[in-house]
Design a protein with these regions (language model features):
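Short, glycine/acidic-enriched loop or turn micro-motifs at the edges of active sites
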Residues: 8-9, 88, 118-120
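Short, acidic (Asp/Glu-rich) active-site segment that either coordinates a divalent metal cofactor
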Residues: 105-142
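Conserved, helical-rich catalytic subdomain that frames metal- and/or nucleotide-binding sites
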Residues: 140-177
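N-terminal lobe of the biotin/lipoate ligase/transferase fold
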Residues: 1-76, 94, 102, 165
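Short beta-strand segments
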Residues: 3-5, 29-31, 81, 97-99, ...
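Glycine- and Gly-Pro-enriched alpha-helical subdomains that act as flexible
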Residues: 81-82, 87-88, 92
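Residue-level signal for inorganic ion chemistry
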Residues: 28-30, 56, 85, 117, ...
Length: 177
């Protein structure tokens, strides 16, 4: 797991850029390895990024509750927007990007670098686009940004490791779960 306080060249899908605010964003990457056979199976390989996004959604909701916070009552849902965006009530809270990287000397597994960017404590006027959201704008009683970042990251890593182990065991079952 790699967490950063500042990102200078954030990017998203299709060469889009990701703008983060130092000290106010969640910028975390996790490297996992998966069997090459999964990556070659076009019926399931696209689900890895969605699984990572789903687990991030679960981590955000769980971490807010774990830290004693709550969501504003007008918030309907935090949801995934295919293929990699995390949205809350039509506004982008963040995104997930997964990239495959070969592992030198290993023919049966590949590395997947899963990066996540979230707006944690970015003030409304500093959000990069009109349709953006920040966790502090939709939730209340949140702790310091560093505490929130660590709580989300810890939940995400736990959930994702468990889900990826299940996916590796039976990728077709997990892709539709």
């Amino acid at each position: 797991v790699i967490a950063a306080n500042k990102q200078t060249a954030g990017r998203g899908r299709l060469d889009h850029t990701w703008t983060s605010v130092p000290g106010e964003s969640f910028i975390v990457s996790l490297v996992v390895s998966v069997p090459v056979s999964i990556m070659r199976d076009s019926s399931v390989n696209g689900w890895l990024q969605m699984i990572a996004g789903y687990e991030m959604r679960e981590a955000i909701v769980g971490a807010v509750r774990d830290c004693g916070g709550g969501f504003d009552e007008n918030i309907e849902d935090i949801a995934l927007k295919w293929p990699n965006d995390i949205f809350v009530d039509g506004q982008k809270l963040g995104g997930v990007l997964a990239e495959m990287v070969p592992i030198a000397g290993c023919e049966d597994r590949v590395a997947i670098v899963i990066g996540v960017g979230l707006n944690l404590a970015v003030a409304q006027e500093r959000l990069p686009i009109d349709k953006a959201a920040s966790l502090q704008l939709i939730a209340h009683d949140l702790p310091d940004v560093a505490v929130m970042r660590d709580a989300i990251a810890a939940r995400w890593v736990r959930g994702l490791r468990s889900r990826l182990a299940d996916f590796e065991e039976d990728s077709h079952r997990e892709a539709v779960r």
